[in-house]
From Swiss-Prot:
Residues 1-72, 130-166 are annotated as: Disordered. This is Large ribosomal subunit protein uL4. HAMAP family: Ribosomal_uL4_B. It comes from the Bacteria. Part of the 50S ribosomal subunit. One of its GO terms (biological process) is translation. The lineage of its organism: Bacteria, Bacillati, Mycoplasmatota, Mycoplasmoidales, Metamycoplasmataceae. One of its GO terms (molecular function) is rRNA binding.
Length: 293
């Protein structure tokens, strides 16, 4: 028994030595961790200036882009107008070469004098004055028939009825319907209307959307008119307004979808605000000047 106990003690002692060895190895692992942390810090320090350089390069690119964007509209303001085409709905730049200079009294109002509220009020005034007010409905007394009592007052079990033209019945009269005595028009001062007209013309002139051109046709033909608009490079616009007294232009332009031909007397503020291009003759310009004066 004593020998067996000695053997067991001998076997236990090397286990203690192994624990000491493991304890001695443990700090080496900690050292490796600290070295790895130091290496990572060095890599971050090396990588930081690169990221800063990339940021600087990005900022420089943005500044170049903004400068190029700001410089574009300054060039186009004087000569071009951006309009949506009717076929592709894409913006197009159109250059109008006017041989006649537009008078400043009509087309040169300052930004302070341009009044959008006057434009809005005048459009409402024009729409209200276009309403004729001829709508009408018939009351139970105006509808034909219905003089006979449909059934007797008592004994049928039905509700009482005195006429088949009662508003409750199908085919009867209408209660509180519209009558032609109503008027929708209202008044606006002449100064406000003139201000709206001039401000809408100046807005078109600021966009360079006014072209002074004497259109003439040999015969009534929509194809010839379209060819002339193609020569002016405005045939694909959504809305073109031509001011002319010529009957040939008026009749040949009725078949064109995006074209509206109007006399100078019937030119309205709403039409001026809807159009993308306005065609005027020299004669109409002189008449406009005389009216304003």
């Amino acid at each position: 028994m004593a020998e067996e106990l000695k053997k067991t003690t001998k076997e236990k002692t090397p286990v203690k030595k192994s624990s000491k060895v493991s304890a001695s190895k443990a700090p080496t692992k900690k050292v490796t961790k600290t070295t790895e942390v130091k290496k990572a810090d060095k890599l971050e320090k090396v990588s930081k200036p690169k990221s800063e350089s990339t940021k600087v390069s990005k900022v420089s690119v943005k500044s170049v882009k903004t400068e190029s964007i700001k410089s574009e509209p300054v060039k186009t303001k004087k000569s071009k107008i951006k309009v949506l085409s009717s076929k592709t709905n894409e913006a197009k730049n159109i250059l109008f070469k006017n041989t006649v200079s537009l008078p400043k009294g009509i087309f040169g109002l300052s930004e302070e004098k341009i009044n959008t509220q006057a434009i809005f009020d005048s459009i409402l005034f024009e729409r209200a004055s276009q309403r004729q007010g001829t709508h009408s409905t018939k009351t139970r007394s105006e509808v034909s028939g219905g003089g006979k009592k449909p059934w007797k007052q008592k004994g049928t079990g039905r509700a009482r009825a005195g006429s088949t033209r009662s508003p409750i019945w199908v085919g009867g009269g209408i209660t509180f319907g519209p009558k032609p005595q109503k008027k929708y028009d209202f008044k606006i001062n002449k100064k406000v209307r003139n201000l709206a007209f001039l401000s809408s013309l100046t807005l078109l002139a600021n966009k360079n959307a006014i072209l002074v051109e004497d259109l003439k046709l040999e015969k009534i033909s929509s194809q010839e008119l379209i060819k002339k608009l193609e020569d002016l490079k405005i045939n694909n616009l959504k809305k073109i307004l031509i001011v002319s007294d010529d009957e040939k232009i008026f009749k040949s332009g009725r078949n064109v979808q995006n074209l509206h031909v109007v006399k100078l007397n019937s030119l309205t503020v709403e039409l001026l605000n809807e159009t993308h291009a306005l065609l005027l003759s020299k004669k109409d310009l002189t008449t406009l000047e005389s009216r304003v004066k």
